[in-house]
UniProtKB/Swiss-Prot annotation:
GO terms for molecular function: lipid-linked peptidoglycan transporter activity; peptidoglycan glycosyltransferase activity. The gene is ftsW. This is Probable peptidoglycan glycosyltransferase FtsW. One of its GO terms (cellular component) is plasma membrane. Its EC number is 2.4.99.28. It is an enzyme of class 2 (transferase). PROSITE patterns: FTSW_RODA_SPOVE.
Length: 401
């Protein structure tokens, strides 16, 4: 317990007081632009459903604004924590992630919405445990890659441990069920292990096995099989199985080049289900047109590119933990954004994943804010390390996190 409390303290002295002028403000402004645009679009997309459910058309806008404020405060707090604290706290976070995934499955604890038990009610907010667990698992895996870096390329046991951890996490996610998050988590793990030096043939074999397992899960579930077959031709059943996707495509088509205007969407008027959450991107395309779509895609592309560059800079500065953490978080956020937009446009089957930073939801917004604050912290420490003379390697060969 003493170790946990020591790790959780806000050690401003160790973080160097945080020189704000050294932060990557281009990345920070990109994040704020996405979150700000998301807030506007949530307010627009949720007007009808909010008025019908609560009598206040701006109900979800107010809540999302509060979530955004909490996310900003949590991000600032994380910026003051050194990466070494997260490196040492990786095992604790791993236990926390599994604890949350188990607790939500206990009858009477987890809240069921649309047939899925993914939330724990906490008063004003429903905690989506998968969002917290995913960040915890990525932090743990980044630390594991540092500790076992020399063994990952050639040792099967070093590769098997994270495989077992993430497979168990995927099983718990599928029990909710949350197929989309399980897919993103496993893809992130494979990508990070590859970047950490795991052999390509092991990654390839595991990828094929996971693809086979995913296929069996789809074939064995009538609901998932219907989603797969519907996505190939949603117009074959536009009023039942293909209803959501066809309404999304109609929204995107109505937007044309410059959109119908902010607030003027027709599809959000109870035609398009989940217009303010999973399918917010469709409403954005309808109201802001291709121009708005290009802007959002460009912002996410820059975020993903910059995240990978930060990881590379951290590795060059002899900060491997920061590098793996940056890569893992970037892959996770970038992949989720890509899947959400692809699903909205009918390029992938429906997964139930939100658009990071933009879709309505407190857990997703807060945890994404924390993840991006960690990315900024990686860049901050890499810049500090690059400006300092490198110490001589110790005889023990211990890798600095």
């Amino acid at each position: 317990m003493a170790e946990v409390l020591r790790w959780l303290r806000l050690d401003l002295g160790q973080s160097g007081g945080l020189a704000w002028e050294r932060l990557d403000w281009r990345l920070a402004l990109t994040v704020l632009a996405l979150a700000g645009l998301g807030l506007v679009m949530v307010g627009s997309a949720s007007v009808s459903i909010a008025e019908g459910a609560t009598g206040d058309p701006l109900h979800y806008l107010y809540r999302q604004a509060v979530f955004l404020a909490v996310a900003l405060m949590a991000a600032v707090a994380c910026l003051h924590l050194s990466l070494d604290q997260f490196y040492r706290g990786g095992p604790v976070l791993l236990v926390l992630g599994f604890f949350l995934l188990l607790v939500v499955l206990i009858p009477g604890v987890g809240r069921e919405v649309n047939g899925a038990t993914r939330w724990i009610p906490l008063g004003l907010i429903n905690l989506q445990v998968a969002e917290v667990a995913r960040v915890c698992f990525i932090i743990y895996l980044a630390g594991y890659c540092v500790r076992r870096h020399a063994e990952l390329p050639n040792t099967s046991s070093a590769f098997a441990v994270p495989l077992a951890v993430f497979s168990l996490a995927a099983v718990l996610l599928l029990a909710q069920p949350d197929f989309g998050t399980a897919l993103v988590l496993m893809a992130t793990a494979l990508g990070l292990l590859f970047l950490a030096g795991a052999s390509l043939w092991r990654i390839g074999v595991l990828g094929l096995l996971l693809a086979g397992a995913a296929w069996l899960l789809i074939v064995g579930s009538p609901y998932r099989w219907q989603r797969l077959t519907t996505f190939t031709d949603p117009w074959a059943d536009p009023f039942n199985a293909g209803f959501q996707l066809t309404q999304s495509l109609i929204a995107i088509g109505r937007g044309e080049w410059f959109g119908v205007g902010l607030g003027a969407s027709v599809q959000k008027l109870f035609y398009l289900p989940e217009a303010h959450t999973d399918f917010l991107f469709a409403v954005l395309a309808e109201e802001l047109g291709l121009l708005g779509v290009v802007v959002v895609v460009a912002l996410f592309t820059y975020l993903a590119w910059r995240g990978m560059q930060i990881g590379l800079a951290s590795l060059r500065a002899d900060r491997p933990f920061g590098a793996y953490l940056a890569w893992g978080l970037t892959i996770s956020i970038g992949l989720q954004a890509f899947i959400n937009m692809a699903v909205t446009m009918g390029l992938l089957p429906t997964k139930g994943l939100t658009l990071p930073l933009m879709s309505y939801g407190g857990s997703s917004l807060i945890m994404t804010g924390i993840a991006l604050a960690l990315l900024l912290r990686v860049d901050y420490e890499a810049r500090l390390a690059a400006q300092q003379p490198r110490p001589r390697k110790r005889p023990s060969g211990r890798v600095r996190p």
